[in-house]
């Protein structure tokens, strides 16, 4: 009987922890934009510009193999007045 109660308790804890994680992420939407698509991406500049302008994270990505990289900025849509 004690083993069953312990199992139920652990399952209950797991369910509550999942619900708490879902509630934390609910309502947070991330947007992304390409910054200066006509110029090649410089990683340090991309990170700094994205943080200063959008309070987000910038990464250099290539749209297709062999093409120059562009700066993609991912940020919280609700945290900016854009």
Swiss-Prot record:
Its main location: secreted. The keyword Signal applies. This is Defensin-like protein 156. Pfam families: SLR1-BP. Belongs to the DEFL family. Expressed in flower buds, but not in stems, roots or rosette leaves. The gene is LCR21. The keyword Signal applies. Keywords: Antimicrobial, Disulfide bond, Fungicide, Plant defense, Secreted, Signal. It comes from Arabidopsis thaliana. GO terms for cellular component: extracellular region. It is found in: Secreted. Disulfide bonds join 31-77, 41-60, 46-71, 50-73. One of its GO terms (biological process) is defense response to fungus. Residues 1-27 form the signal peptide.
